[in-house]
């Protein structure tokens, strides 16, 4: 039987790169907290954008897709799903909304985990929503020649309820240890959840929801304003490689959590860095959208396109970005390079 024991996080023998990552994240978290108090409206707008990106990306990782227009309608207007994929997306929307609105009262307990899974599966009409798997499952991979092979055998269905009970208790025990850094603990728990693979379907999406839940409960809420799931999707090859490395030997209690911890923390760090970019202005100035566009271009060491600026500042409309860039070109503070789609802007 797999044993869940996180006491190794309390022995002081942690890789230096992980310790440095947690320190860097903590510093960015403090800065974000100060900004959130001062710029409430900007954070509200960023949250609305990130929610759409999170729902789109987490489902896309699993091959569940629809058009951007339909994603926005489902998320922002509660539009009724038109097909099976959209039903899956609507379920994820509801589960994510529940976490955003009520994370303080949702915990890493079996009852809450099952309820979130049921919510996520509700629109798709699966009868197994909110229930652990009843049949064993395997995780397959396909090689370059098209041959399938078993990459990982998760916990058997018969042992899953007991394993989830032990996982819950191990987490609650480690959470109460003041000497264990919660940023290191959370990815360990998420890895174990993925290796148990407790549900017939939806384990990957549930792991991302639970990641956000535990991060929010510990005050690390960058994923509310810069999509955590989108960062995973953008670098999913690294994510799956870290998962592969950390799950090797898991059944025999011989795995190393460190590759997955590093990937998880790197993803969170990227969220905080992206959030920091969106406030790239001189401290003390009123942060208007115009000022943020100007600072983004003026502080960049490389030429930026309008699309790149819009990605850095998703709450600022393309029309506003274009107007500010035009004014900056006229005043001579920036110069335009190239033409058409190849147009870039750089400090003059």
Protein language model features and the residues they cover:
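FIC/Doc superfamily catalytic core
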Residues: 1-348
